[in-house]
């Protein structure tokens, strides 16, 4: 029997320290709900988890971007609906003026209304804005022979670089849709039956252009709606994968915590018992 080194107490103390450390980690994981709280808990798991978190946030923002794009398209289509209604009215007046029963004075009165409607087409084009950006004046138009200055609307609809799409909106001024002469302020004339007759064909071409643009906007919107669904599903699945890596399994962790708590209590008792054992040496000295 020796008294300088109590090996039983030293062993019990070492094991108790390990158990207390494990118990502290269990408490940390249970209180935070995460099994990876620092790089030391799982270095590779932390790296993968952080990449996934970045991707999840990117996917969520991309979904919001796509939803904002849908709003942009809906606003544009709303303005074009107004322009379409005006064009229908101008066409109706042109058909009316083509009829030979009207006098020149009658057609003059019809022309007054047409002039006001054409001015309204220009007003809509110049005032149609989204977040301060003009939408129908050619800012987002495709490059053509007449229009080489373009700036299509880019919508970033992915979590990573270059995952984006373009939205094009043509010029929808009165001149662009044919109800005002190119290069002048002169309004389409329906002052004579022949003029009114030709105007009907011109207006039909303008309506084709507007309807084509509205159809394009509808296609953009349908695509973006599907994009939002896909992004939301991707974010959800990535979140589930990240949760598997990083989140604590509370039931399993509670089992480990209970085990370590019992071991800590037993270790404390055994350490006390080991210290008592050395005191028995005193009986030999009495």
Swiss-Prot record:
Q: Where is this chain primarily localised? A: periplasm
Can you name a GO cellular component term? Answer: periplasmic flagellum
User: One GO molecular-function annotation for this sequence?
Assistant: structural molecule activity
Location relative to the cell: Periplasmic flagellum; Periplasm
Keywords from UniProt, A to Z, are:
Bacterial flagellum, Glycoprotein, Periplasm
Q: Which SUPFAM superfamilies match?
A: Phase 1 flagellin
Enumerate the Gene3D superfamilies for this protein.
f41 fragment of flagellin, N-terminal domain, Flagellar export chaperone, C-terminal domain
Q: How is it modified after translation?
A: Glycosylated. Glycosylation is not essential for motility.
Q: What does this protein do?
A: Component of the core of the flagella.
How does the annotation summarize its subunit structure? The core of the flagellum consists of several antigenically related polypeptides.
Q: Which family does it belong to?
A: Belongs to the bacterial flagellin family.
In terms of PANTHER family, this protein maps to: FLAGELLIN
Name of the protein in its database record: Flagellar filament 31.3 kDa core protein
Q: What organism is listed for this UniProt entry?
A: Treponema maltophilum
What gene name does this entry carry? flaB2
